[in-house]
Amino acid sequence: LGDVYKRQKLAKRECSEARFTHNGKRYFAIAFPNGSGGFEVRNRYFKGCIAPKEISHIRQSGKARNTCYVFEGFMDYLSFLTLRQESCPNYPELDGQDYIVLNSVSNVNKALYPLGNYERIHCFFDNDHAGMEALRQIRKEYGRDLYIRDASQTYNGCKDLNEYLQKQVERKRQVRSVKETRSQSPKKKNGFQL
């Protein structure tokens, strides 16, 4: 329950709720803002965009950062923040770098100009052809001048960072379930029983 609460709190800080009509049906969804006034919207039944489609560039306040973490979609960005807070709850270091969310790998060209302001780029793309192609485009543009890290190795064996988080959550749930079952089992008596 604590994990769910943390994720909900994080989503409330980073996103908003959108209510909209699509094909004559009313929906509500989580809405993640982009840099042009549009939103990426998601719910169980719908994945889309309230135009215009654009990248989301999250800059930290204060001095300029020299590192940027780049994500394919906002669910991966939220998954990263969740994993970082869970692994380092007292000092998650979420503001040590800026973030760019492509909101689609087709937006990678829109991210190239702002990425030129960073010395280090960490790419958290999907483990598929489109993700590798986006990484290749960034390396082609800046490979000689900047440090570019393929961070998808962190969640190797999963499609993306969000799937990795979901597997971690499921693993924790299973461990908790086993512990609860063991604690509820009747204790064995010492000795033999005839």
Q: Where would I find each of the regions flagged by the language model?
A:
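Short, basic/aromatic recognition patches
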Residues: 7-22
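Sparse, context-dependent recognition of short Cys/His-centered cofactor- or disulfide-binding micro-motifs
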Residues: 17, 24, 65, 123, ...
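Short, small-residue-biased leader/transition segments that mark boundaries at the very start
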Residues: 1-5
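TOPRIM fold recognition
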Residues: 82-194
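Phosphate-handling DNA/RNA-contact segment within nucleic-acid enzymes
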Residues: 20-114
